[in-house]
Amino acid sequence: MKRKLFWICAVAMGMSAFPSFMTQATPATQPLINAEPAVAAQTEQNPQVGQVMLGVQGADAPVVAQNGPSRDVKLTFAQIAPPPGSMVLRGINPNGSIEFGMRSDEVVTKAMLNLEYTPSPSLLPVQSQLKVYLNDELMGVLPVTKEQLGKKTLAQMPINPLFITDFNRVRLEFVGHYQDVCENPASTTLWLDVGRSSGLDLTYQTLNVKNDLSHFPVPFFDPRDNRTNTLPMVFAGAPDVGLQQASAIVASWFGSRSGWRGQNFPVLYNQLPDRNAIVFATNDKRPDFLRDHPAVKAPVIEMINHPQNPYVKLLVVFGRDDKDLLQAAKGIAQGNILFRGESVVVNEVKPLLPRKPYDAPNWVRTDRPVTFGELKTYEEQLQSSGLEPAAINVSLNLPPDLYLMRSTGIDMDINYRYTMPPVKDSSRMDISLNNQFLQSFNLSSKQEANRLLLRIPVLQGLLDGKTDVSIPALKLGATNQLRFDFEYMNPKPGGSVDNCITFQPVQNHVVIGDDSTIDFSKYYHFIPMPDLRAFANAGFPFSRMADLSQTITVMPKAPNEAQMETLLNTVGFIGAQTGFPAINLTVTDDGSTIQGKDADIMIIGGIPDKLKDDKQIDLLVQATESWVKTPMRQTPFPGIVPDESDRAAETRSTLTSSGAMAAVIGFQSPYNDQRSVIALLADSPRGYEMLNDAVNDSGKRATMFGSVAVIRESGINSLRVGDVYYVGHLPWFERVWYALANHPILLAVLAAISVILLAWVLWRLLRIISRRRLNPDNE
């Protein structure tokens, strides 16, 4: 017995020697809660010197230096939580989450979660609590105290940085109770509201990474970084046409990778950047900080350290001349999968197949039916689980000129599976498009309908359904969101204290099959122009060819930094819309060369002299003087298209001012009636700053429509003024219907005349047949 007591005491003393690795949170008896985990304290005492950069293996992997540069970031729920940023956690939907990433060349050394929440006044103290998880690891628990009920509460919880990876999810789980027995999880008294001002305070430390192109495009673009990709472009001086084209290809490729994050390409002439950047240099023209670099004998792409900061990397695009730089740029855009080492030589980039119209990777294909599997952006996008499953969303990016006016609908064949309701009730699947309800389908509880279950590897208990849906075509735009909501009538426990019914709620599972299809292949391409909304939303008409092979950009001779920045930001924005680089873009600084070209024209800086007198132009910006034509009647709503008489120019006003202004204008090309001109103009450096800000800001682009968008300090004002022209092709009968669509009275008159003529022809035909039948000898 003494031996047993000895061993028990020894084990107890040994266990007490271990530090506690469990996050502890003190009850929130004060307005501010500070939950300090033992691990966090230990981390501060022992800095993480020597931690290997995540995702990199081997003896040469970079480590965290104690004196390395760091940055402090505050991510609010308004920025990173699902809209609107606040969360209401309920008994049947107890979970809410936020997501954030970590760049490959950084590690998080400190993290603090700041919560602002209000618990329901009906909750039971202490039994109700808020659990915090990071990547499914419990970070701590915040009990709800009596003093907090119905009041705004502030809480701080340290997050262990050892659990932070390249992609992270912070999950809040609400455990709520409002009575000791016989609770209903659907009770409206079970809630906890998390405010949108809650957030994460993170300290990132930069890693001293190797110069290795095998990780390209990291660190110049990191898909784990949710911020706008700001990537300076450095030139020795004002670039000529060949170098402008090469830099535009690189910018459009980075834009295609940035996607929804946005992109910004500041331009520097013979200056050192203060962050990761792209540098263009030839043997004869190079920035001063590269003057000692050996001359190259071929197109070379090299990753080097910043001369003054080893934590900043420069991607240098070298060449003997502009032709080499153009080949190197195409190598970045199309051959980067082969990059490795500190430098690569681009021997050849040879096109094998030409691009086709409307084949942009980010657009839904219009030449055949498309499966939902092709539209997924991540693996589990088309499935959901929960007592009330979250909605399933699918994005549809369409060409802006898809003609859907007389369409009866878009064919969509949906294959879906779902957990079978236990009884026949009102459980259903609702389908919405752009927040507009389309159709609803009942979720059947009949087991005999489960015939397709054996043909596909799914869990037992799921019911298969196949449904055809017609989408109202007029509700579609260039960017669309298709939403599937599965609504279950879940049985809930309840009763009284003496007669209580309890059971364990079972999660429901719903799946939209990858083989579901949507078909846009039966429709023509036809659009009235000018339409700056098509340009602002999808880069149209330039994006019709994803490689911009039918686009000519007219630049000023010896462009300044702001004008080059406008070029790079514009092609970067178009690349983000198409998902493909502008490898075949043509750039010129001679406005006379565009005459007679079968191409869409992008003008940056100023209207060429040969076009200044064109009657189609509705606005002109030149230094301090500008003029604009205004229409007879103007509507502020982009969805309302005025008729021809309202668009007619009524006045032309000319003004002189020292204030900054920029503009985007669209008009028909004088050289081809199926081509368009988009001009991006500014009158000063501040004007170009506002223009670039508008190009990079999706919210400001959304306010552009019509033929003229004027950009001032106060915002953007758009006008529809001047003549309308049409781009695309319609059969003659569709053109007739389109012409009559805005004239219902004329359409009714023509319909009546057509009926009368048809009746007269039939009457004459019947008379002839009757005469021949009664007098066969007269044949």
PLM features: residue spans?
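Positively charged n-region of N-terminal signal peptides that target proteins for export
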Residues: 1-4, 743
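Sequence-pattern detector for short linear motifs
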Residues: 5-7, 27
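Solvent-exposed alpha-helical segments and adjacent loops
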Residues: 26-779
